């Protein structure tokens, strides 16, 4: 997030016509990005991991392309997605991580992670798989169209905070990504 903050400050400065500030924040951001890429990459796992020097996977690294840290077609990201599929995907649900935490081994999948995987697949050109996983997620909404924070991968029971803004925002943002733009749909031939 340090990199994202500095990168966004550079973009804001550029938009405001402040090239010196933009150059400053870009100069601060780039070494942080390089440290992130080098520190989070685990050669043995062939994946970006939860923390520098860690062997544990965390689905949050699926956000790296969206944040602009790395391109989705980078071989390291492609390999990371494959690792996530092998180790964090449970019956179409994506665990945030598989390592034990303060509460023990995770038993429920964090719903936003499914949308992160859909976005990753979409970015990698796996459009049919992405759409199928997204449509399947819609079946877990309650009668008001709402999602909770977590879901039990074995039963499909919603768990955790309800309704969960993070899950709902993920649904909306992913739906927008998978949709044709209004310009393409209504104003182009």
Question: Positions of the model-derived regions?
Answer:
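Inter-helical turn/loop segments and adjacent helix faces that build the functional surface
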Residues: 8-26
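Alpha-solenoid helical repeat scaffolds
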Residues: 12-15, 127, 140, 181
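Alpha-helical positions within canonical tetratricopeptide repeat
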Residues: 20-24, 28, 76, 129
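Extended glycan-interaction surfaces of carbohydrate-active proteins
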Residues: 30-111, 132-189
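C-terminal substrate/ligand-recognition segments
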Residues: 107-127
């Amino acid at each position: 997030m340090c990199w994202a903050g500095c990168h966004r400050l550079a973009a804001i400065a550029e938009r405001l016509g402040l090239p010196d500030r933009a150059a400053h924040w870009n100069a601060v951001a780039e070494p942080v990005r390089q440290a992130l890429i080098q520190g989070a990459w685990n050669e043995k796992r062939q994946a970006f991991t939860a923390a520098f020097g860690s062997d544990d996977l965390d689905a949050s690294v699926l956000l790296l392309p969206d944040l602009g840290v790395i391109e989705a077609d980078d071989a390291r990201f492609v390999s990371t997605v494959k690792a996530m599929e092998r180790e964090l995907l449970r019956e179409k649900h994506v665990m945030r991580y598989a390592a034990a935490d303060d509460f023990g081994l995770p038993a429920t999948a964090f719903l936003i992670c499914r949308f992160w995987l859909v976005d990753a697949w979409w970015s990698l050109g796996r459009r049919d798989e992405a759409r199928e996983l997204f449509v399947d997620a819609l079946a877990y909404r309650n009668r008001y169209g709402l999602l909770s924070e977590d879901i039990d991968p074995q039963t499909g029971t919603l768990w955790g905070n309800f309704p969960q803004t993070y899950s709902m925002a993920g649904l909306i943002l992913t739906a927008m990504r998978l949709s044709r733009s209004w310009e393409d749909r209504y104003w182009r031939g």
